[in-house]
């Protein structure tokens, strides 16, 4: 009997340790320019290994303060990011810029509020965060496990900022612009003027297929063209690797235009998503990571959207 008790104890201990270890974010920032760093997210879907850390988080160190771009998927993630930033600089984290409300970018907000950071987010996306945040939090907990979301909560905060907005971190100026009704209802784009690095959030994806749950494809397409024509050395997308050349922006453009055209044609012809899926994923889209999952999930959303217009 004691043997079985010991076995049960060891199993419980192992499972507890496993749950704890799975909740540690093994992340390391990459310095993409002097005092500009990026935690590049996993390019897979959120799962119980990556803990939802699938988007890119950045931070910029000035002479007086630090600015962080995107809070990440959870309180634990944000805590780890802050811990790492403090190992690079003792300066205060004064600003958190949240590019939009999607969980992988915003669910770490409460931790930054705890340390006194000023949260900057478009009003349209604050509204979405408040409206859908708790529902989305329940969904991601169910999807990958509660252990990743310890202390994660949707918190109230105000926003009195108007865009474009200019911030001075001390010898380092940052501009923030609002791109309304693009990938989301209010995407923020952040440029570090010293390094000519632009953080564009989910207006641009590399390596993987772009997602379109709240997108206005027409505007989004225009915004990518606008970003492409700006003067920059590097672009940090919301997902995927560093962008060094303009051609990398075309991957997002091609996908969103293709899925948009397919959805509109389906509505015009009365074609159902199932009929399109029976033909398989188009060959030109197969090079995108997560292409099949994204195509199957997002095409019906667009078709339903255009049918209701």
Residue ranges and their predicted role:
Residues 1-8:
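Bacterial N-terminal signal peptides that target proteins for export
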Residues 39-55, 131, 138, 207-214:
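Acidic/histidine-rich helix-loop elements
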Residues 65-67, 73-75, 166, 173, ...:
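Metallo-beta-lactamase
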Residues 229-231, 242-309:
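Accessory terminal helices/loops
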Residues 35, 60, 70, 85, ...:
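Divalent metal-coordination and catalytic microenvironments
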Residues 16-18:
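N-terminal signal peptide c-region/cleavage motif recognized by signal peptidases
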Residues 33-84, 188-200:
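Conserved beta-strand hairpin/beta-sheet module of binuclear metal-dependent hydrolase folds
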Residues 83-166, 261:
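Active-site HxH/HxHxD metal-binding segment of metal-dependent hydrolases
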